[in-house]
C-alpha cells in the first residue's frame, strides 16, 4: 500500500460498515480468492456517491458484483448501473449476487470484452469506475472519455499497483513487470 498507514486507518475509521449482503458477498469472494475492492476504496466510493449523487454509473470489471452492489446500495435509489464483465465463470455468480441483493433491476451486466462493449454504448455516465485489466486502461480511455459526462467523475482502482508503478523496472517483481510495462 502506498498510502500512509495512519491515513488508511483514519479512512477506515470513518466507514460505517456495509450491509449484510455486501458482507456476505465480500466474504465469499475472499474465500474464493476473487479480488474485490479494498476497504479504502469502498469508503472512497461511498463518499463520492454521497457527494455527487450520480444517476448513471458505468463499471468496467464486474467480477462477482461486489462493487456494483456497493454502488447500488449507496447511490440514489433511481441510479442505474451498467457493468461489464468478460470472465464467463464469474458472470453467473455476479448475476446471482445482484438478485440476492435485490438489485437486478438497478444493475445491468453486459457480457464481453470491455474494449468491444464500450464502443456500443452511447449514453453518458455521471461516474465511471474502472476495475479491470490495468494494462488495458489505455485502450479503453478514448471510449471512457467519450462516455463520461462533462463534470463527471472517473475512478480507476489500483492504477498505482501498490506503488510498483513509481518504482524502477528492476525493483518490480518479475510477475508484475508485464502490468508495469503496460501501465
Where are these regions (language model features)?
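A short alpha-helical cap/connector motif
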Residues: 1-129, 134-155, 159-183
